[in-house]
Every structure is written in C-alpha cells, then in structure tokens.
Amino acid sequence: MPKRLDINTILVIGSGPIVIGQAAEFDYSGTQACQSLKEEGYKVILVNSNPATIMTDTATADKVYIEPLTLEFVSRIIRKERPDAILPTLGGQTGLNMAVELAKSGVLDECGVEILGTKLSAIEQAEDRDLFRTLMQDLNEPTPPSEIIHNLDEAYGFVNEIGYPVIVRPAFTLGGTGGGICHNEEELIEIVTSGLKHSPVTQCLLEKSIAGCKEIEYEVMRDSNDNAIVVCNMENIDPVGVHTGDSIVVAPSQTLSDREYQMLRNTSLRIIRALGIEGGCNVQLALDPYSFQYYVIEVNPRVSRSSALASKATGYPIAKLAAKIAVGLTLDEIVNPVTQKTYACFEPALDYVVSKIPRWPFDKFESANRTLGTQMKATGEVMSIGRNLEESLLKAVRSLELGIYHLELDHLKELDKETMKKRIIKADDERLFIVAEAIRQGVTKEEINEWCEMDFFFLQKVENIVNMEREVKANVGNMEVLQTAKEMGFSDHYIAAAWNKTEREIYDMRKENNMMPVFKMVDTCAAEFESATPYYYSTYADENESIVTDRKSVVVLGSGPIRIGQGVEFDYATVHSVWAIKEAGYEAIIINNNPETVSTDFSISDKLYFEPLTIEDVMHIIDLEKPEGVIVQFGGQTAINLAAKLEEHGVKILGTSLEDLDRAEDRDKFEAALTKLGIPQPVGKTATTVEQAVAIAEEIGYPVLVRPSYVLGGRAMEIVYRQEELLHYMKNAVKVHADHPVLIDRYMVGKEIEVDAISDGENVFIPGIMEHIERAGVHSGDSIGVYPPQSLSEKLKEQIIEHTIALGKGLNIVGLLNIQFVVFKDQVYVIEVNPRASRTVPFLSKITGVPMANVATKVILGQDLVEQGYGTGYHPEEKEVYVKAPVFSFAKLRSVDTTLGPEMKSTGEVMGKDLTLEKALYKGLVASGINIPTHGSVIITVADKDKEEAMEIAKRFHEIGYNLLATAGTAQSLEEQNIPVQVVNKIDSEDYNLLDIIRQGKAQFVINTLTKGKQPARDGFRIRRESVENGVACLTSLDTTRAILRVLESMTFSAHSMKEITQTKRHEVVHA
C-alpha cells in the first residue's frame, strides 16, 4: 500500500550516549531513518542527547532537539511540537523503553500521537519475558525450559527443579545488563539480585542453560502487507553462552545444511508475523549440533547491532527501508538503493564471507574480568570481507588495531595444555588465539571441540591457517607459497617475520611478481544484476571491479573500531571531511572497517573500501587509485600512526606535514618549539630508563604525571604521589626503552581549559574555548566540559587566545588542532597540543554553527580561512550555556575501578544546554543517567588530603536538607565544624555497615576520594563498585560534587529561621 498521507510530522527517538551494548550503530540507523522519512516528504523531529553524532546535525532532521531522553523532557517536546506519530524502533533499547514509558504515562494519548513501525503490544510481547514465552508456546516454537521470577525464593524453586547451570536474562535491558550464567548458589544469589535491580520491571527469566548449541541469527524484515524476507543470516563462531555482541560472527552462516537453514528461516518468519512487526527485527536461535532440535532464544523487535552488521555485510540498508515500511510502504514498492533496479523484496545473496570480531576495552582496564558470558563487554567491533573464511578472519584480526597482524599472540606461547584447556572452556577475549595456539602445539580438533563445542568446520579453518604457517616457514622465498598464503589472508607483516625480511621488501617482491589483490564490489545480489554501489573489498582473484576514474581523488582514513578514547566523534569528523572533499570537486574515497558507523555507509563517499587500516591494506588501495594525497587528521590516533609509513611509501600527507605532526607529538621537539614561542608549560622531562625516571621525579618534586609518548585516551597515564608508586608504574604499566620514552611532568592542580582551533598556516580561527569542571589530572574525555567558560577572566581568555594563535602558526598547523591548557596561580600553561580532530569537534561545531571538520578539510585542500569567510581570532560566544557530560559503562565491567584520573574511562557523552549553568548541568547530568533527588542522604568518605575541602561541601549538603552519613574519621572532622552527621560502620565491620546502606538504596550520593592504591581490594574500590552495582551516583572528584551541589541548590528553596538571618546581619554591622 502507498505511504500514509494522514500523518505529516514524525518524532524520531535517538539512542542517547554510547555505552557498552549500544554503540555507533544507532547513529547509523537513526541518520538513515531521518533521511529516508524526509525523502518521503514528512517533517522529521529528532530528539537525542548525544552531540557526537551525525544524527544530531541540524541538516539530518527538520528540527533537532539535543535533550535528555527522559520522560520529563521528551513529553515536553511532544507537547510543544505535537507530532502525529513517533518512531522509536531505531533508537535501540533506549528508544523502545522510552516508547513504553511515554505510552504508560498517558502523554501519547493526551496529544494524539501514534507509535509507528512496531506496535506497543509487539514491543512488550518481545521484550517482556513472560509474554514472549507464552507467544512461543502458542506458536509451538520451542524455548529452553524456563521460569519468570521476581525474587530470589522463586529462583531457588526453579533451580531445585532443573539443576545448574542456569541463564539469567533480565527483562527490558540492554546488552544482557545484569544477567549471566550461574553454575552454583553463590553465583545465583549475585546474578539474580543484580538482574532484578537492572530490570525496570523487576523481572528476570531463568532458563536451563543450552550453552554449547550453535547460535544462529536471522535478520528479517516485514511490511504491513505481510511480505517478509530474510536479509541476512549469521552464525556465531562461539556457541551459545557468549553474548552475541561479544561473539565472533560470520555471515552467511557456514555450517548449516539446507534443511537446517530453511527450518530456522521459516521459524524466524513465523515469529515476525506473529508479533506483527513492521520493519526490521532480529531473531536469535540455538541449534543442537547433533539433531534438528532448536530453541528460540530471543527477539529484538527493532533495528539492532546485528542489523547494522547485516546492512554492511549485504549492502542492504535495513534502517532506511524500516523507516519507509513504518510509514506504510511495502517491500514490493521500495526500490533497492543498491542495484536501483530490483525491489526491496528480493532477498540478498552473498558471494563472499564476512567476519565480525568485537573490540574489547581490556587493554584499558587491566583489572577487568575478561571472561565472556551473557553480559556484553565489547565497546565496538570490526568487520572484514574475504572470498574464504580464513582470509576474512585474518583481515578482521588485523583490523582490531591491537598491534596484531596474525592469529597469534606472543604471550600465549608459554601456556601449557591445562591452562589452555581452562581458558578455552571458560571463553575470554583471546579464545580464538588460544585455539590456534593449541592446534600449533598439537592438540586435536576433537579435544578442542570437547572443551568448548566450537564447530569442527571453524576448527578446521583455524587448522588450515596453522598448516599454512608451517608451509610459509618451510619455503622461504617461494612465490607459489606466497601466493597461496596471500589468498588465505596472510599479512606481509607475518610473512616478513617468517622470512626474515622487512614488510616493505615483501610488498615490493609481490609488486614485481604482479601478486596484488583485486577489489570486488558488494552488490547484494551475488553479481546477478548490475550494481550502482561503489562499495569494495580486496581479495586475491582475477578480475578487478573497482574502476579508477580520471577525476582527482582524495583518500580519508577512518578511525576503525569504537573503543574507549576513540569514539564516534572521530567518525563524525570523517564523514564531514568526506562531504567537504565532494563539495570541493574531488572524488572522496574512504577506508574504514567499522560496520556500525555512518562513514561506512556506501552512500556517503564516492568510493568506500571496507579494509583493515594497516599500511599494507591502505597501500593496495593507494597503488590502484593514485590519489592526490591522504588526509589523516580525522581518524584519531589510528590514522596519525600510519602517516610516517605512508610518507615512506611516497604518499602525500595532506594538511599538517609529517614533520610538524612529529613536532607536536615528540616531547623534546615540542618543548623546544614552546620555548622558542615563549609559551610556558609545566616542568617536565623524558626518561628512557627506570633510574632516570626516579631522578627526574626527585628533581621536579612529587606529585608527577607520568605517561608514554604518542598515546590516545590517556592510555597508561597516571598521577604518582611517591617513589614506590612510580616504580610500580614503571614496572607494570609501560615497557620503557629508548624508542618508547616515558614523559614525566610536574602535576599542577589547576583549572583545565580545552581549545579547538583551525589553522591554515597564516590565520588561526578559534570556534570555542571550553572549561573543565574537574581540575587538571582528570582526563579531558572524562571531565564535564562547559562552554562558554564561566570563571575565566578576560585577561586569562586573551592569554589563551594569544597562545593558541601562536601555536597554530608556530607549529605550521594546516587543519585542526586541539590544545589543553591548565590555569595555575593566574598563569596559563600548555599541557599538550594535538594536531588533529579531537573529541570535542562535534560538540563545538553544533553549538557555534562553525562546521569545523568541513572548514578544516577545505583548508587542507588549499582554500584558506579568509576565502571561507573566517579570519584570525575568537568566534563570538553564544548566550546559552552548554555542558558536555561523560557517560560510563561501569555496570557492564565488573572489577573495574570507577575513580576518575588521567586515563580515560568513559564510553560516550551527552549534552545539556540551557540559559544558566545550573540548568544546563542538570540536563547534562540527568541525560548521563545520574539521578538528582532534591533530598535524601549522602555518604562522605574522603582521603585526609581532601578533608578540608570536603567540609565546605558537607555544609552545603546539610543546608539544603540532606542527611550526612560518614565513617568515624570523617565524622569527627564534621562534628568539629558543628555539622550534624550520622556515624556509620566501616565496611569491614560485621554489623550493619556502609555497604549495606548502599545496597538498600538508603543513600542518594556517595562521595569517595579514598587513598590511591591500584589493588582492587582497597576499601574505596569496594565502596565505589557497590555504588555502581546498585545504581547510586558515586562521585570521586570533589569538583563534580560541587557541580551537582550547584544544581541541587538551584532546585531547592532555602529555609532559614528568622533568628539565623538576623544574627548574620548583626555580625555584618559589627565588622563594618
């Protein structure tokens, strides 16, 4: 049926900040949906709290609201805008939960708003574990034996009947939050308690564990006419028991017989029809490898992480079509945008293999528990495409950017068989590498299958790779062996090491022998129809399908997988850069490997290469395309790290030159440049040995800030207060030597300021200056940022502007630069300069209306700032106040300390904007998930060095009517200041103690700045973790606490007796 004409305005709900379980895939689906609805002539209103997205650009929708995704704010927008309908199914779990909340509150009925796409009843049937189980029983679809529970007693009842292990799945949660597998009573108590807490309806499904079955996913679409198709089916290499977001996934499925494939396909279609879903939907199934017995695990009645992967794997744009279906169009009316000839009701066919490997944050969090289970832990993922599974897997491995070029890790070589067995049974992020190591050491496929039930087909593929390694090592210099190895996806890096040559020598050897890859097109139809998409992958085959045009081209390097420190902000900059290249009349080519992002949507660039970002893979494309040059500024550290190698290959780096990039990153050169420019910086030196480090720290004086050079996201950065901590750091955090020096700086406790600027070498334009609420020492990505700065004097601002202009010109920056300053005793010091796009580019671009990545790209391509209408100087400040607040995923990562410091820990960000700082802060904090009740209790436990400062904070909490709780030491200090306080027992007390108060929800805030110590056993760590597990705001910085107090004070009316008021007035007269 044709599209609906009875609705005009549609409100699209975004997915909010990036957290583990909900990453950039919703920026991609939301952006697609908004464009798709606008194409059909609807007025689109978007609400989302995440400023780092393409989706929240003003051009994406007719009206964009960057506001908290809470009932209070979304209801306000609905009442103001009066949309005819809302579309929640493209905003992930956040969007779905919001729709349910809006419907229950009555605001949709009150304003006459209907829910498009998937009806509320279908959302509830799929998300509510009880209703879903009933529906499956009605359809005669098998589900594992299970029971809905609402408390621990009911859980015991089920386990007594069915036995361990059992899987706990909380209702209405994201990425398996709060769930897990229980093997014994202790785990049952812990996981069920946590699951009930995380479920908004206090409901969990307990099911008999079917771990060990194959996990298969079907991505299906259905329209209002009941046409339904399978877009893509995928198979998890890891059997059931590991969350699909943490599994290595291949598409299409590799081990299903036709009968199994058709059986599961029919089931998936039957379920989507029974639920009445209109749009995209993801069905997860478990298949017993030894019989035709299968189980339905769950259904996501929305666009999901898997649908982003399916879209990129097949080229079939699910979100775009789901939006069209939501407004009444049917699959046989929608033209497939890939072929532009066939209709969307054709099921895609693949003539290649796609692999997805998750990217975990364990390189950042050494203390995290690396075991994988039903609760997701990955922050992002990479995808690769090959003609065979071996090639596809090895390309994915080198896309992860962990410095790994092959399916082997040096530190696993020492493992004995028993350790390998344990780790393969348990499943962690290195399982596939351990499987390869076990095969190298002669463990049979039968044994490995017995340990982890990974299918023999996949084990055979790993064995093929291991056998090929032996061939390579035994046949040094043999061209035929080299050809076979390349067809299997082996990297030059690996072959060079085996043949004792350099990577460059192998590359040149292949070039001489015409052993270069060709590029194949992703066309959704296995080349049956001609395709109009410029979307390519490399492989070693005969025919090259990537036609080089005679237009001048520019290559942009993307930023790879989403991880802590390198989030969606860099993808935002990449996309804007590509658009600017097109506007300037060049052909824009993008190289990236992240299936979740907007940049890897084939409609963004003129050509998209889905490839690993390694020197070998990038050079293959450059050799073919021969571009004018490569832009590395927008791909975060990933792209910057490739610059030197590209230049060695004779490739032109556009924008800031390699020499100037190096001057900003290399400590000694940078110091020399600052001295020459007369710009002060904290005293600091470089150490290349442990002894040197100790001597430097003594000379500068503690506390010192230590870090390796060339890092992103403050990896392995620490503030050290005494010598033993320094020695611990030098031994455990870094391997120091001449090539990898460690920087040691005087740590200044001052106000941190961040500036983004654009320079063309002559002019330097500054769109905005941001002030951090947390003082220097907390990573800028984890600080609350405020624009415009609220407490800088005009004199300091002028100093900052002067320094920024001097640095832009003095370092010969062409393009973007980001500078971090610290204000200490009324003097401005430079902490660091990053000659590239920063995390704050999207935030400042949205606020100031200066499209920074676009302007910078045009500068890089030779159009100076004056030609573009900008000159040297500072952009006029906006009237409103904007706050950027960090969002953390601690609830998903047990045993990670939540204390903020110089190493970045947040996964995402939100924006709050309003007329005053307090209101903007309120929005930012609420959007980031912090509850701000106007009364209640606050627990204060602070280190001795913070006691004095904490007194003033405690007094203010008391003034607004908060009840203060503290352990003996802190309580004594409070009593001395005449501040009423209730003493609570320390956590090692057998009696009712501090942790019990947190567990029972009797504290609204916990302020905890306990002594530094990296061993998690410390008291402070336990207090902080308990707060996270129980959803209580735990503040580890007194600056953040002050910000929250400002908000609370602005929300509460003061209450003083008349006597108090007159007494203070009398004192004023006396002292006059």
Curated annotation (Swiss-Prot):
UniProt binding sites for Mn(2+) 1: Q284, E298
Binding site for ATP 2: R707, R746, E752, G777, V778, H779, S780, Q820, E832
Name assigned to this protein: Carbamoyl phosphate synthase large chain
Enzyme class label: ligase
Cofactor: Mg(2+); Mn(2+)
Stretch list, region Carboxyphosphate synthetic domain: 1-401
Binding positions (Mg(2+) 1): Q284, E298
Location of the region described as Carbamoyl phosphate synthetic domain in the Swiss-Prot/TrEMBL record: 547-929
Sorted UniProt keywords: Amino-acid biosynthesis, Arginine biosynthesis, ATP-binding, Ligase, Magnesium, Manganese, Metal-binding, Nucleotide-binding, Pyrimidine biosynthesis, Repeat
Positions bound to Mn(2+) 2: E298, N300
Organism: Bacillus cereus (strain ATCC 14579 / DSM 31 / CCUG 7414 / JCM 2152 / NBRC 15305 / NCIMB 9373 / NCTC 2599 / NRRL B-3711)
Chain positions recorded as Mg(2+) 2 binding sites: E298, N300
